[in-house]
């Protein structure tokens, strides 16, 4: 069984010849500082696809608040593809589906805001969305005004039906349209990483997808019967893009896609998934059915220690420190000079851990940060058990 073994929080409490002067806080261009930490929330697509309506959205918002998820940091309720009618009106305006949303979208947005939450919608840079609804191509400024009038807070902007369109230009046009409309809206570039959005997305949006869609499995590729495309297990996505962590940071995040926690994987795989998304500073956008959420799933999604790792203000994405015989060690520096170290079992058999701290020096060459366990003693905290495990004077073995 594939499983996460443990994730340790290393707190420096005795320093000799150690300087935090090497810790560099990333500077980032801001679009109204809307996403200084990775956005957290819920999106309808993973579980419901286009089978959405206002009752589902209201129930999800109610549970987000009542369950404590909102208090844990989950803020956005995002309606994905399928919220609009199949055709625009006579004036070219988008029309929320009157059957799915009989009270109107404006009323639904107000309901979400009254809960202390934020609301998001979906559209596409192409002529049609991925599910065949009206896309935004040629309507960018009109649609931006529509979103501003609705008072939404988040726009996921997909990349289907975009033949002949330049990605950078298309997303820049929509970004300018949103700013011209006057309502600050978090802009999610769902471009799948095909045109390297990390190279040009920083002044355009607040987050960008780095891959195709996620699939609820540890390390698989799911080939769709219709069309020449695949969805990916969460470890496949993590390994898909190399050397892009330096582009991610406050207000401009590498987006590893929505979470599949609670969607059919084992409890250990769910914990591994949530741990790695936290380590990678990915947006934490839940994709499960809150109405059927188990206590175990809620506990994973609400783990305040891992959420704190994800939301650390330094915003540096973690990286793989070592890998041997299916056992990987991932590390992530934090804003206070401390570190998170995750031991991840990629194999199908139980692995023993042995880690000699004094023989290890972790160097983050992208951000010029170092952890030297020979000169610095760290207190060790297991983030899943919320339990202190001594310090780095003693080696780890279990």
Predicted region positions:
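Bacterial Sec-dependent N-terminal signal peptides
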Residues: 1-21
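N-terminal module-boundary/linker segments of secreted carbohydrate-active enzymes
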Residues: 21-58, 63, 185, 344
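Structural recognition of the beta-strand scaffold that forms the well-ordered cores
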Residues: 38-44, 73-79, 118-123, 153-158, ...
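Aromatic-lined carbohydrate-binding/catalytic grooves of carbohydrate-active enzymes
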Residues: 60, 64-164
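Glycan-recognition surfaces
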Residues: 186-289
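Catalytic cores of secreted or luminal carbohydrate-active enzymes
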Residues: 271-322
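Carbohydrate-binding surface patches
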Residues: 277-280, 285-287, 323-369
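Intrinsically disordered, low-complexity Pro/Gly/Ser/Thr-rich segments with frequent PxxP/GP/PP motifs
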Residues: 385-398
């Amino acid at each position: 069984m594939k499983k996460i073994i443990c994730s340790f929080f290393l707190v420096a409490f005795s320093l000799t010849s150690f300087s935090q002067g090497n810790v560099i806080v990333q500077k980032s261009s801001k679009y109204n500082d809307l996403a200084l930490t990775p956005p957290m929330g819920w999106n309808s697509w993973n579980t419901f696809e286009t089978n959405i309506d206002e009752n589902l959205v209201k129930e999800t918002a109610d549970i987000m608040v009542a369950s404590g998820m909102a208090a844990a940091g989950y803020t956005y309720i995002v309606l994905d593809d399928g919220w609009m009618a199949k055709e625009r009106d006579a004036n070219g305006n988008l029309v929320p589906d009157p059957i799915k949303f009989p009270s109107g979208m404006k009323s639904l947005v107000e309901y979400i805001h009254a809960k202390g939450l934020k609301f998001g919608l979906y559209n596409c840079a192409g002529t049609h969305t991925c599910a065949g609804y009206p896309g935004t191509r040629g309507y960018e400024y009109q649609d931006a005004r529509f979103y501003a009038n609705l008072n939404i807070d988040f726009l996921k902007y997909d990349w289907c039906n975009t033949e002949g369109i330049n990605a950078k230009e298309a997303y820049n046009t929509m970004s300018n349209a949103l700013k011209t409309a006057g309502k600050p809206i978090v802009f999610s570039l769902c471009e799948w990483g095909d045109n390297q959005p990390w190279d040009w997305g920083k002044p355009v949006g607040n987050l960008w997808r780095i891959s195709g869609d996620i699939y609820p499995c540890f390390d698989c590729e799911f080939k769709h019967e219709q069309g020449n495309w695949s969805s990916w297990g969460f470890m496949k996505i993590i390994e898909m893009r190399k050397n892009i962590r330096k582009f991610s940071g406050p207000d401009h995040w590498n987006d590893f896609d929505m979470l599949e926690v609670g969607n059919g994987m084992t409890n250990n795989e769910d914990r591994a998934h949530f741990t790695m998304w936290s380590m990678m500073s990915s947006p934490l956008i839940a994709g499960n059915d809150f109405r059927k959420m188990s206590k175990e799933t809620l506990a994973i999604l609400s783990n305040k220690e891992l959420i704190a790792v994800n939301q650390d203000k330094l915003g540096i994405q973690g990286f793989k420190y070592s890998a041997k015989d299916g056992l990987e060690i991932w590390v992530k520096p934090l804003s206070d000079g401390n570190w998170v170290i995750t031991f991840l079992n990629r194999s199908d058999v139980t692995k023993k851990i042995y880690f000699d701290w004094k023989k290890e020096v972790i160097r983050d060459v992208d951000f010029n940060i170092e952890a030297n366990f020979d000169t610095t003693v760290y207190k060790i905290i297991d983030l899943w058990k919320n339990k202190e495990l001594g310090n780095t004077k003693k080696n780890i073995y279990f």
